[in-house]
Regions:
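Non-catalytic, conserved peripheral segments adjacent to functional cores
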Residues: 1-82, 86, 102, 108-136
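Histidine-centered metal-chelating micro-motifs
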Residues: 84-86, 90-95
Length: 136
């Protein structure tokens, strides 16, 4: 499945909002890990890497940020805001910039955490030279 960005349905009722993510419909892999980013200083950046094996689905639960994606044709910029979801397959360069002060995103991962970061390419020049063409 290629990179995808889409809005989730937001249900508003009696003073709150509910946003469901149906795993069977929105996540094309078995979820092995969930993590989230909160309390970022306004303007913070995170990510800026690709994975060799890991696939991820990101959900912007609150706030906004800029998603920087390279799916094989150079960097693209996407606004990522409350209620948006994004599927990032392996070998797609990704990161988030300009997080708002209230930004919170949740990530659903196909792999368990590995502290040695052997599944990462964090050098964009190396990514462009060696890995960009491997996108499924």
């Amino acid at each position: 499945m290629p990179f995808k960005l889409w809005p989730l349905k937001i249900w508003t009722n009696k003073g709150y909002s509910l946003t469901p993510l149906e795993l069977k419909d929105h996540v094309p892999f078995e979820v092995k890990r969930v993590y989230w980013v909160t309390q970022a200083a306004a303007g913070t950046s995170t990510g800026q890497h690709c994975h060799f094996d890991e696939q991820e689905v990101f959900v912007c639960a609150q706030g906004s940020m800029t998603a920087v994606i390279d799916r094989g044709n150079g960097k693209e910029i996407f606004e990522f805001k409350t209620g948006d979801a994004m599927y990032v397959p392996n070998f797609v360069w990704h990161g988030f910039e300009n997080l708002s002060a209230d930004a919170m995103f949740i990530a659903f991962s196909s792999t368990n955490y590995s502290a040695d970061r052997s599944d990462y390419c964090e050098d964009y020049e190396k990514y462009c030279a060696e890995y960009r063409g491997k996108i499924a």
